Structures are given as structure tokens and as C-alpha cells.
């Protein structure tokens, strides 16, 4: 009897033996890479998959138009590594979801099940990445180990020996064990890998700019991985800017190029370079993309290969993230922030930007695709010059109203001049938009107003007097009957759709009135005893008082004194602990005193100086010249301080506790926790997070 063996099954069995530990794979891929859990729903974007194969030229899809996105369920994920370069990649097996199955579970069935939630809560293993210097990559040299890595990742070193030395065993992504000699020596003393390091450099063909990753597993084993250097400066090697300009050099202070969400400009002349030392070699072939797209359209299972270090966005995106992003009605002028990872994946930074246009990237082949839907401009264009288009689910919305930019050094009596933004008409003329803000939502344009009124931010210097009153600046309550042609409300009956069953939702309708612009006041303004509450101008979260409001504060203090003498307890000074409380009318028509951050601005019938210390301090990461502002007045304990710093810099809280130092008002250097937190908030003016707490760094 002859037995036939399934060749595909044998191949899968052989590949299963080569699969990596998921934790080591993620350590090599970078902290921002998130693979979809098994059994979760994702949207597969053939357009994004084609970008993975553009080293061979544009991908052509014969036999009709391919849909922009296909809803699929993840059947399996295999974490693997290239046998020649050690570059990690993943093979994702997808099963298209039938049309009659798409509406059953909704957003709740997007992969955040019990298994996915448990995996997300698991504590990540300790890992450390370092970009190799020229000295580290020299043949015959040694590797300078950062102190943090030596003390937290490597086995404990016996410092009583002279000199302290040990043998370190590290397993690479293929299971090969490498032996290094770890010694602590020199003047000043430092940790070094000596014997065995040159062999590792030669075998792995490491050069300066490559990154080395060390990870300690749960059972104490040490693993080592590699991240190849990206050529071409900002944007990674896969994105070379269109000729004639040469590829930019890395910006000073850190190259924000190498990470999975770093996007390139979609110019036709762009080519994908290779990571294999200058050879133009795409890891994914165009025919593989065409085959996967055809299988997806026909509803058959298919497999895709994803390289997280390829500097192209993930093309298998969590379904819930896409749906949530497309519920937003995008239009020009929206402010957003987006996370980027440094070249060695050691730090995550957020960059601010503005939506400059909302337009499909390829209207010929993908007319309804949300892929790279947003054209953006950045507040720091030098670092992000190649990032010209982004997908909506990669950004976090900060403000959905265009900012009103005021002259930063205007004279105090200069009248307010509001620029005539086409998206924000002031004079009653409402132009019909030429392009809808969301091309996927038919009938909804950038001039649509939302049932949920959102305040608009005002940027610029303080203005003591405006040509128009602040209350007049409110475009108060436009009735739906007055809205012109082309100004649509979101609570219409029909839900627009895009390809493959993706429904573009809208917020729940509340009433037929919406407020286009609100400055520093709630959306529901009510009168009390015929008096209108004055609006308040906010700058960086603090109230800016005009001369009129200051005079009102004097009058209010007199009224409060009179009402208190009459025994009316309701008219006493408001001493609430809210961050900012504006003047308001109470039941008897008197006005409560102004307060800022819980400190009354009226005392002894006189207005206090509003320029007092606000409890802010600057936070600096080691080797950074630019600090970040932290408001200590909203922090209640050292535990909350460490949590905020961990979220700000993407560092584990446990790693921060012994590395945060500060200088008080007298300039003395102290460690957080040396004094009570209440005293710390009063004296701290500068925080320093030192990854290396040696004496030289502390002296700085």
C-alpha cells in the first residue's frame, strides 16, 4: 500500500521547527509592532501589501479591480527569522469573512478576546537594544555594554573579584548559542564583551549602525538578536526621496527612521531599497501579492508575509481600529499626534501635525481606499520630511477644529483678525466644498457640523482687548434650517458604506442644533436672571484675564463682602479645588471670585498677581537637549509621577524609580523620594532621567 504525504503539510511542519519565541521576535521587531491575535478580525489592504513588494516595481493586478480592503479572520501567526540576515518576519494566515458573517459580532469581535487580553497583560521580558558604534563593530574589538544592560539583563557579576569577569551565553534567533567574555575594567570602569565578540561580528556581518538586542527570558536564559541598519536617513532604507535630491542624512539628536509606521511620500519615482547592504532586493515578490489578493477576493484562505522592519505600515490592521478611525469625519485643519520609534527602538516620541488635505492616494486603482487617506504637514518637518501621507488609524486626533492663529507679538490694543479659513467661514458665506472630507462617506463633507460641539483651541499671545467681544465670537447655535446647501448634519438616516462591508458610522444624534465654534465655555450656555456669563480665554490650560474681567473681579469682591455681611452663605468666595474656575453668576446675581488652580485670585478685596508659579517643571531624558513640560500640580504622589513619566517616555515604571533626579530652586541635585512629595512639588524645577547614573552624568 502506497501512502501519499501532503507536501504542504510537511513544509509547514518543517517551518514550525524554525519558529521563534514570540517574545524574542517582538524584542527584535520593536516595541510599536503589534501582531494581530489568532481568531481576531483584521482588514487586509492589498494596496499596503503591494508596497511591501515595490522593490520589483509597481504591482499590477490583472483581471479586474481588487477591492480596497477585505475583512478577514486571523487563522494563525508564525514568527520567523531570515537564516542569512537574522531579520525577523511573520507569516500570517488569513481567512476572508463571508458577507453573511460580518455583522454578527461587530466591534466586540476584533481580537480582544480572553486570550488576547491575557497576552496583553503579561509582563514583557527585560530587553535592551544598542546601536553599534564604529568601535563596537571593529574587527578584533570589543563591545561596550551599557551599564543598565549589564546590571539588569546580564547575569549578576561578582564585583568582589579582581577584575570582575564572567562568561555569558546568549542564544540567537536560530537557537545557536554564542559565548562571550564579560569583564568590568578600565578607567573609568566600564562593562565590556571581549573574547567571542569579534567572531559574532564577523559571522553576523555587523556594521556600525546595526543594533544589537539582548533579552532575558522568564527562565533566566539570555537571548541576542539583530536589527539591521536602515540606509537613506529619515524614513528608512526602503524610502529614498525622489530625485534629484540625495537621501537625507540622519538628523542630529536621533534618527527617527526605523520603525514599522514610518511612512514615505507616495511619489511615483520612489523605489524601495534593500536592507541587504545596498542590493535592491524586495523580500516580497509582486506575484505573491497578486496571488494573495485574488484568493482574498474569491473568499479562499491565503497567507501573507510581513516584515516589521521594512518601514512600511502594517497592511493587516485590526478591524476595530479601522472602523473607529473612519467614524471620524476628516477634513483639512484637524490637529493630530502620531507616535514614532527611534532607529534602535529604544524610545517612542510623539510628533504633532496638521491634516492638510483629505484625498485618496490612488484614485485610479483604489478610488474608495482609506489607505494613506490623509495628507499631512508636520510641526517638525525636517525629521519627518518623507512622511507625507498617513492612514487615519495611525494618528490620534487632538482637535477637530482648525486653530485660530493669532500674531504672537501683537500690541495689547490690536483688534482680533480671524483668518478666513475655507473650512471655518465667519462672515456667513458658506462655500460648497470641492472635496468631501471623507470620500468614503458620501454626502458628508468637510463643512459638516457635529452633534457633539468640540471647543477650538486658540494659539498665540495674550490679547487684552478684541475688536469683537468674546461672546460674539461664538457662532451660536446654527439651526439646521439655516444651514446652506453643502452643509450637512451627521445624523442623517443612511449610513455610507465602503468596499468589503466596512460601515462608516456616525455619532448618535442628540438634537438638531450644533455649535461650530466655542471658546473656553461649555456648549450649553444658559442665562441666569437675565445675565450672560462672560466667556473666558484659555491659554495652555490657564485663564487669561482681560481688563474688563479684572475690573469685574474687583466688583465681585465688593459684592461678596456685602452678601457675606447679610448672612448669605451662598455668595461667599468659591474655594473649590478645580484647576480653573471662571466667573459665574449665582442665584442672587452676584459673581463668585476667580480662582486658578485652587488659589483664589481675590484676597482682601484686591486682585492678586496671576503670574505666580504654576507648579510646572521641565523633564529631560539623558542625551536630550530639549525638555518636556510636566504639570506637578495635577500629580498627587511619587507613584503617579513615575507612571506619568513612564507613559511620557515609553519606559517601564520599575526602571524609572532609581534613575530620576531633580534640581530644586537652589540648584541642589536630589533623588526623587528624598523629601516629602508636597515639598518636592514646591522645589522641583528640572527633572533628569539618567540611564547611566555614574558620577559623570550626575555632575551634569
Swiss-Prot record:
Residue ranges, annotated region (Disordered): 234-254, 560-595
Location in or out of the cell: Nucleus
Pfam families, alphabetized: ARF_AD, B3
DNA-binding feature ranges: 128-230
Tissue: Expressed in roots, culms, leaves and young panicles.
Keyword Ribonucleoprotein among record annotations: no
GO molecular function, one term: DNA binding
Keywords assigned: Auxin signaling pathway, DNA-binding, Nucleus, Transcription, Transcription regulation
SMART domains attached to this UniProt entry: B3 (SM01019)
Function: Auxin response factors (ARFs) are transcriptional factors that bind specifically to the DNA sequence 5'-TGTCTC-3' found in the auxin-responsive promoter elements (AuxREs).
Name of this protein: Auxin response factor 18
Organism: Oryza sativa subsp. japonica (Rice)
Protein encoded by which gene: ARF18
Amino acid at each position: 500500500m502506497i501512502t501519499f504525504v501532503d507536501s504542504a503539510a510537511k513544509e509547514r511542519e518543517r517551518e514550525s521547527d524554525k519558529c521563534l519565541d514570540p517574545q524574542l521576535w517582538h524584542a527584535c521587531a520593536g516595541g510599536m509592532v503589534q501582531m494581530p491575535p489568532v481568531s481576531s478580525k483584521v482588514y487586509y489592504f492589498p494596496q499596503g501589501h503591494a508596497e511591501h513588494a515595490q522593490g520589483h516595481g509597481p504591482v499590477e493586478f490583472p483581471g479586474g479591480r481588487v477591492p480596497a480592503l477585505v475583512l478577514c479572520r486571523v487563522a494563525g501567526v508564525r514568527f520567523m527569522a531570515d537564516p542569512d540576515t537574522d531579520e525577523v518576519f511573520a507569516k500570517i494566515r488569513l481567512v476572508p469573512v463571508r458577507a453573511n458573517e460580518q455583522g454578527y459580532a461587530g466591534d466586540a469581535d476584533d481580537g480582544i478576546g480572553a486570550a488576547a487580553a491575557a497576552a496583553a497583560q503579561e509582563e514583557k521580558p527585560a530587553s535592551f537594544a544598542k546601536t553599534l558604534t564604529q568601535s563596537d563593530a571593529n574587527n578584533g574589538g570589543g563591545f561596550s555594554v551599557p551599564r543598565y544592560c549589564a546590571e539588569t539583563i546580564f547575569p549578576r557579576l561578582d564585583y568582589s573579584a579582581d577584575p570582575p569577569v564572567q562568561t555569558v551565553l546568549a542564544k540567537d534567533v536560530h537557537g545557536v548559542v554564542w559565548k562571550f567574555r564579560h569583564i568590568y575594567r578600565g578607567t573609568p570602569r566600564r562593562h565590556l564583551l571581549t573574547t567571542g565578540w569579534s567572531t559574532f561580528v564577523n559571522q553576523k556581518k555587523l556594521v556600525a549602525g546595526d543594533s544589537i538586542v539582548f533579552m532575558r527570558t522568564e527562565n533566566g536564559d539570555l537571548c541576542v538578536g539583530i536589527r539591521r541598519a536602515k540606509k537613506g536617513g529619515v524614513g528608512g532604507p526602503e524610502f529614498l526621496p525622489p530625485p534629484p535630491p540625495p537621501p537625507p542624512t540622519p538628523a542630529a539628536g536621533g534618527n527617527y527612521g526605523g520603525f514599522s509606521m514610518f511612512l514615505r511620500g507616495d511619489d511615483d519615482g520612489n523605489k524601495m531599497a534593500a536592507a541587504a547592504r545596498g542590493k535592491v532586493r524586495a523580500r516580497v515578490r509582486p506575484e505573491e501579492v497578486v496571488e494573495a489578493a485574488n484568493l482574498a477576493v474569491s473568499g479562499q484562505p491565503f497567507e501573507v508575509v510581513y516584515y516589521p522592519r521594512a518601514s512600511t505600515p502594517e497592511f493587516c490592521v485590526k478591524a476595530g481600529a479601522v472602523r473607529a478611525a473612519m467614524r471620524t469625519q476628516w477634513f483639512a485643519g484637524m490637529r493630530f499626534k502620531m507616535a514614532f520609534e527611534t532607529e534602535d527602538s529604544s524610545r517612542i516620541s510623539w510628533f504633532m501635525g496638521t491634516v492638510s488635505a483629505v484625498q485618496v492616494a490612488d484614485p485610479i486603482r483604489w478610488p474608495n481606499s482609506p489607505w494613506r487617506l490623509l495628507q499631512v504637514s508636520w510641526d517638525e518637518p525636517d525629521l519627518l520630511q518623507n512622511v507625507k501621507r498617513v492612514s487615519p488609524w495611525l494618528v490620534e486626533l487632538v482637535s477637530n477644529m482648525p486653530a485660530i492663529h493669532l500674531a504672537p507679538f501683537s500690541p495689547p490694543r490690536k483688534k482680533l483678525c480671524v483668518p478666513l479659513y475655507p473650512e471655518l467661514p465667519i462672515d456667513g458665506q458658506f462655500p460648497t466644498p470641492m472635496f468631501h472630507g471623507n470620500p468614503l462617506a458620501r454626502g458628508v463633507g468637510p463643512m459638516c457640523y457635529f452633534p457633539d460641539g468640540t471647543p477650538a483651541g486658540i494659539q498665540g499671545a495674550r490679547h487684552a482687548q478684541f475688536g469683537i467681544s468674546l461672546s460674539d465670537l461664538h457662532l451660536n447655535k446654527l439651526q439646521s434650517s439655516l444651514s446652506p446647501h453643502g452643509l450637512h448634519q451627521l445624523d442623517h438616516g443612511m449610513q455610507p458604506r465602503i468596499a468589503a462591508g466596512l460601515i462608516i458610522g456616525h455619532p448618535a444624534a442628540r438634537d438638531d442644533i450644533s455649535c461650530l465654534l466655542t471658546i473656553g465655555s461649555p456648549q450649553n450656555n444658559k442665562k441666569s436672571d437675565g445675565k450672560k456669563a462672560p466667556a473666558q480665554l484659555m491659554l495652555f490650560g490657564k485663564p487669561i484675564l482681560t481688563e474688563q474681567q479684572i475690573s469685574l473681579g474687583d466688583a465681585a469682591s465688593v459684592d461678596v463682602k456685602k452678601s457675606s455681611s447679610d448672612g448669605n452663605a451662598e455668595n461667599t468666595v468659591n474655594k473649590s479645588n478645580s484647576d480653573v474656575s471662571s466667573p459665574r453668576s449665582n442665584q442672587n446675581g452676584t459673581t463668585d471670585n476667580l480662582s486658578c488652580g485652587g488659589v483664589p485670585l481675590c484676597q482682601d478685596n484686591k486682585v492678586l498677581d496671576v503670574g505666580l508659579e504654576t507648579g510646572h517643571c521641565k523633564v529631560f531624558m539623558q542625551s536630550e537637549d530639549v525638555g518636556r513640560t510636566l504639570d506637578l500640580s495635577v500629580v498627587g504622589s511619587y507613584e503617579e509621577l513615575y507612571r506619568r513619566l513612564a507613559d511620557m517616555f515609553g519606559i517601564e515604571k520599575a526602571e524609572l524609580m532609581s534613575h530620576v533626579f531633580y534640581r530644586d530652586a537652589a540648584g541642589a541635585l536630589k533623588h526623587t523620594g528624598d523629601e516629602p512629595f508636597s515639598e518636592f512639588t514646591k522645589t522641583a524645577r528640572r527633572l533628569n532621567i539618567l540611564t547611566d547614573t555614574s558620577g559623570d552624568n550626575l555632575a551634569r
